[in-house]
Amino acid sequence: MNQERVFKVLLGPHVSEKATVLADKKGQFVFKVATDATKLEIKKAVESLFSVQVERVTTLNVLGKSKRTARGLGKRNDWKKAVISLQPGQDLDFSSSAE
């Protein structure tokens, strides 16, 4: 996988209360990913970017909410979320990967 595709697959970490609990208790990390990304692409991107061994990748599609605007109803974009499970003894460090 080329370096350009790695940065297009992983859009960034998803920070929420549930994602923080998963990271603290189970060592799982949540990322926003491209909607066309596959589990294998996500696994390779995380392994190459953070130099860790990924055990499992779980993905889910999040549907955008309908919101009212001044001009009527609008809809937020759909997006894809990936939960990354690392092998035992592995940990992600977001600060050291920004080289």
UniProtKB/Swiss-Prot annotation:
Ribosomal protein recorded as keyword: yes
Listed GO MF terms: rRNA binding; structural constituent of ribosome
One cellular component (GO) term of this entry: ribonucleoprotein complex
Pfam families, per the entry: Ribosomal_L23
Keywords for the protein's UniProt record, in alphabetical order: Ribonucleoprotein, Ribosomal protein, RNA-binding, rRNA-binding
GO BP term (any one): translation
Record text on subunit structure and interactions: Part of the 50S ribosomal subunit. Contacts protein L29, and trigger factor when it is bound to the ribosome.
Family annotation (NCBIfam families): PRK05738.1-3, PRK05738.2-4
The protein's role, per its UniProt record: One of the early assembly proteins it binds 23S rRNA. One of the proteins that surrounds the polypeptide exit tunnel on the outside of the ribosome. Forms the main docking site for trigger factor binding to the ribosome.
Designated name of the protein: Large ribosomal subunit protein uL23
Organism encoding this protein: Pseudomonas savastanoi pv. phaseolicola (strain 1448A / Race 6) (Pseudomonas syringae pv. phaseolicola (strain 1448A / Race 6))
